[in-house]
Protein backbone atom coordinates (compact mmCIF):
# COMPACT_ATOMS: atom_id res chain seq x y z
CA UNK A 1 0.00 0.00 0.00
CA UNK A 2 1.15 3.61 -0.56
CA UNK A 3 3.08 5.17 2.34
CA UNK A 4 3.40 1.81 4.10
CA UNK A 5 6.34 -0.53 4.52
CA UNK A 6 6.21 -4.11 5.69
CA UNK A 7 9.07 -6.06 7.24
CA UNK A 8 8.80 -9.85 7.36
CA UNK A 9 11.63 -11.93 8.77
CA UNK A 10 12.46 -15.55 9.56
CA UNK A 11 15.91 -15.69 11.21
CA UNK A 12 16.89 -19.30 11.83
CA UNK A 13 19.44 -19.99 14.58
CA UNK A 14 19.11 -16.42 15.84
CA UNK A 15 20.36 -17.48 19.27
CA UNK A 16 21.05 -20.89 20.81
CA UNK A 17 19.53 -22.61 17.76
CA UNK A 18 16.21 -20.81 18.17
CA UNK A 19 14.36 -19.00 15.37
CA UNK A 20 13.23 -15.37 15.45
CA UNK A 21 10.26 -14.30 13.31
CA UNK A 22 8.83 -10.85 12.67
CA UNK A 23 5.94 -9.30 10.76
CA UNK A 24 5.77 -5.51 11.15
CA UNK A 25 3.81 -2.87 9.25
CA UNK A 26 5.06 0.73 9.34
CA UNK A 27 3.04 3.72 8.19
CA UNK A 28 4.72 6.87 6.87
CA UNK A 29 3.15 9.80 8.74
CA UNK A 30 2.15 13.09 7.13
CA UNK A 31 5.03 15.07 8.59
CA UNK A 32 8.40 16.56 7.71
CA UNK A 33 11.46 14.37 7.20
CA UNK A 34 15.16 15.11 6.73
CA UNK A 35 16.97 14.53 3.43
CA UNK A 36 20.56 15.50 2.57
CA UNK A 37 23.05 14.99 -0.24
CA UNK A 38 26.68 15.60 0.77
CA UNK A 39 30.11 15.06 -0.85
CA UNK A 40 33.52 14.04 0.49
CA UNK A 41 36.33 16.59 0.50
CA UNK A 42 38.95 14.02 -0.49
CA UNK A 43 36.95 12.69 -3.45
CA UNK A 44 34.51 14.95 -5.28
CA UNK A 45 33.03 11.95 -7.14
CA UNK A 46 31.90 10.40 -3.86
CA UNK A 47 28.56 11.38 -2.34
CA UNK A 48 25.91 10.33 0.17
CA UNK A 49 22.18 10.80 -0.41
CA UNK A 50 20.11 10.03 2.67
CA UNK A 51 16.60 10.38 4.07
CA UNK A 52 15.39 9.74 7.60
CA UNK A 53 11.67 9.32 8.37
CA UNK A 54 10.91 9.42 12.11
CA UNK A 55 7.79 8.77 14.19
CA UNK A 56 6.42 6.02 11.92
CA UNK A 57 3.56 4.18 13.68
CA UNK A 58 4.40 0.46 13.68
CA UNK A 59 2.18 -2.51 14.43
CA UNK A 60 2.81 -6.23 14.31
CA UNK A 61 4.63 -8.95 16.18
CA UNK A 62 8.09 -10.33 16.85
CA UNK A 63 8.36 -13.88 18.21
CA UNK A 64 11.36 -15.46 19.90
CA UNK A 65 11.73 -18.42 22.22
CA UNK A 66 7.97 -18.90 22.49
CA UNK A 67 7.27 -15.29 23.45
CA UNK A 68 5.40 -12.71 21.38
CA UNK A 69 6.48 -9.06 21.43
CA UNK A 70 3.49 -7.00 20.26
CA UNK A 71 3.85 -3.58 18.61
CA UNK A 72 0.83 -1.28 18.91
CA UNK A 73 0.54 1.34 16.15
CA UNK A 74 -1.17 3.75 18.57
CA UNK A 75 1.93 4.08 20.76
CA UNK A 76 4.91 2.30 19.15
CA UNK A 77 7.08 3.98 16.50
CA UNK A 78 9.84 3.15 14.03
CA UNK A 79 12.36 5.11 11.97
CA UNK A 80 13.31 4.61 8.32
CA UNK A 81 16.98 5.16 7.44
CA UNK A 82 17.34 5.19 3.65
CA UNK A 83 20.63 5.95 1.92
CA UNK A 84 22.42 5.63 -1.40
CA UNK A 85 25.75 6.83 -2.67
CA UNK A 86 29.33 6.27 -3.71
CA UNK A 87 31.40 6.27 -0.53
CA UNK A 88 35.07 6.58 0.27
CA UNK A 89 37.01 3.65 1.72
CA UNK A 90 37.62 4.70 5.33
CA UNK A 91 34.86 6.36 7.39
CA UNK A 92 33.66 6.96 10.94
CA UNK A 93 29.98 7.71 11.46
CA UNK A 94 28.14 8.82 14.60
CA UNK A 95 24.37 8.61 14.42
CA UNK A 96 21.52 8.92 16.92
CA UNK A 97 17.77 8.73 16.47
CA UNK A 98 14.61 8.74 18.59
CA UNK A 99 10.87 8.48 17.95
CA UNK A 100 8.45 8.79 20.86
CA UNK A 101 5.82 11.08 22.36
CA UNK A 102 6.29 14.03 24.71
CA UNK A 103 3.12 14.95 26.58
CA UNK A 104 1.16 12.95 23.99
CA UNK A 105 2.69 14.79 21.00
CA UNK A 106 4.84 12.92 18.41
CA UNK A 107 8.49 13.83 19.02
CA UNK A 108 11.75 12.64 17.55
CA UNK A 109 15.21 13.65 16.51
CA UNK A 110 17.96 12.68 14.10
CA UNK A 111 21.60 13.48 14.89
CA UNK A 112 24.65 12.55 12.86
CA UNK A 113 28.13 13.52 11.77
CA UNK A 114 31.47 12.16 10.58
CA UNK A 115 30.20 10.48 7.40
CA UNK A 116 30.87 12.73 4.36
CA UNK A 117 31.57 16.48 4.46
CA UNK A 118 28.82 18.13 6.53
CA UNK A 119 30.16 21.71 6.27
CA UNK A 120 27.38 22.66 3.83
CA UNK A 121 24.51 20.67 5.40
CA UNK A 122 23.79 18.51 8.43
CA UNK A 123 21.15 15.90 9.19
CA UNK A 124 20.62 17.25 12.72
CA UNK A 125 16.96 17.97 13.35
CA UNK A 126 14.19 17.88 15.96
CA UNK A 127 10.72 16.66 14.98
CA UNK A 128 7.74 17.86 16.99
CA UNK A 129 4.05 17.61 16.09
CA UNK A 130 4.88 16.92 12.44
CA UNK A 131 7.29 19.82 11.93
CA UNK A 132 11.09 19.76 11.53
CA UNK A 133 13.27 22.15 13.56
CA UNK A 134 16.80 22.26 12.12
CA UNK A 135 19.90 22.17 14.31
CA UNK A 136 23.49 23.15 13.61
CA UNK A 137 26.51 20.92 14.35
CA UNK A 138 26.15 18.21 17.01
CA UNK A 139 28.86 16.28 18.84
CA UNK A 140 28.73 13.08 20.92
CA UNK A 141 31.25 13.17 23.78
CA UNK A 142 32.12 9.58 24.71
CA UNK A 143 34.58 8.76 27.49
CA UNK A 144 37.84 6.93 26.78
CA UNK A 145 40.25 4.80 28.78
CA UNK A 146 44.03 5.47 29.10
CA UNK A 147 44.63 3.59 25.82
CA UNK A 148 42.18 5.74 23.90
CA UNK A 149 39.46 3.08 23.64
CA UNK A 150 35.91 4.40 23.84
CA UNK A 151 33.88 3.42 26.93
CA UNK A 152 30.59 3.02 25.10
CA UNK A 153 28.67 1.89 28.19
CA UNK A 154 29.59 4.98 30.22
CA UNK A 155 27.29 8.06 30.05
CA UNK A 156 27.70 10.25 26.96
CA UNK A 157 27.20 14.00 26.64
CA UNK A 158 25.41 15.19 23.48
CA UNK A 159 25.60 18.88 22.59
CA UNK A 160 24.73 21.12 19.63
CA UNK A 161 26.78 24.16 18.59
CA UNK A 162 23.67 26.38 18.69
CA UNK A 163 22.80 25.28 22.25
CA UNK A 164 19.41 23.96 21.18
CA UNK A 165 20.03 20.30 21.96
CA UNK A 166 21.74 19.23 25.19
CA UNK A 167 21.50 15.85 26.83
CA UNK A 168 23.04 13.02 28.83
CA UNK A 169 22.75 9.58 27.24
CA UNK A 170 22.74 6.58 29.61
CA UNK A 171 23.52 3.36 27.68
CA UNK A 172 21.72 0.13 28.51
CA UNK A 173 22.93 -2.12 25.65
CA UNK A 174 25.84 -2.09 23.19
CA UNK A 175 25.14 -4.30 20.17
CA UNK A 176 28.66 -4.62 18.85
CA UNK A 177 30.00 -6.46 15.83
CA UNK A 178 33.47 -6.54 14.33
CA UNK A 179 33.95 -8.06 10.87
CA UNK A 180 37.34 -8.17 9.16
CA UNK A 181 37.46 -9.52 5.60
CA UNK A 182 40.95 -8.03 5.08
CA UNK A 183 40.01 -5.94 2.03
CA UNK A 184 37.05 -4.50 3.93
CA UNK A 185 36.29 -4.29 7.64
CA UNK A 186 33.50 -3.01 9.90
CA UNK A 187 33.65 -2.19 13.61
CA UNK A 188 30.14 -1.38 14.85
CA UNK A 189 28.74 -0.23 18.18
CA UNK A 190 24.96 0.18 18.09
CA UNK A 191 24.22 1.55 21.54
CA UNK A 192 20.70 1.74 22.97
CA UNK A 193 19.80 3.73 26.06
CA UNK A 194 17.95 6.58 27.77
CA UNK A 195 18.41 10.29 27.04
CA UNK A 196 17.62 13.12 29.43
CA UNK A 197 18.00 16.77 28.45
CA UNK A 198 16.46 19.67 26.53
CA UNK A 199 15.50 20.39 22.92
CA UNK A 200 14.63 23.91 21.73
CA UNK A 201 12.21 24.47 18.83
CA UNK A 202 12.51 27.22 16.21
CA UNK A 203 10.17 29.52 18.16
CA UNK A 204 12.22 29.16 21.36
CA UNK A 205 9.95 26.62 23.06
CA UNK A 206 12.04 24.37 25.30
CA UNK A 207 11.08 20.70 25.49
CA UNK A 208 12.20 18.55 28.40
CA UNK A 209 13.33 15.03 27.58
CA UNK A 210 13.46 12.52 30.42
CA UNK A 211 14.63 8.94 29.89
CA UNK A 212 13.50 8.85 26.25
CA UNK A 213 14.78 5.78 24.38
Residue ranges of predicted features:
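Structured soluble/peripheral alpha/beta segments that form catalytic or ligand/cofactor-binding pockets
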Residues: 1-213
Amino acid sequence: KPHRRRIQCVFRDFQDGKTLTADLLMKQPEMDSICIATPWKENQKAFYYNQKVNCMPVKGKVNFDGRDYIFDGRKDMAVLDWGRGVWTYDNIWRWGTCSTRLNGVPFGFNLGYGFSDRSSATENVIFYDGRAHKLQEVVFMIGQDDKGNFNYMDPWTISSSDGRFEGIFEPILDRKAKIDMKVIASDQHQVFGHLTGTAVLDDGTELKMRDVI
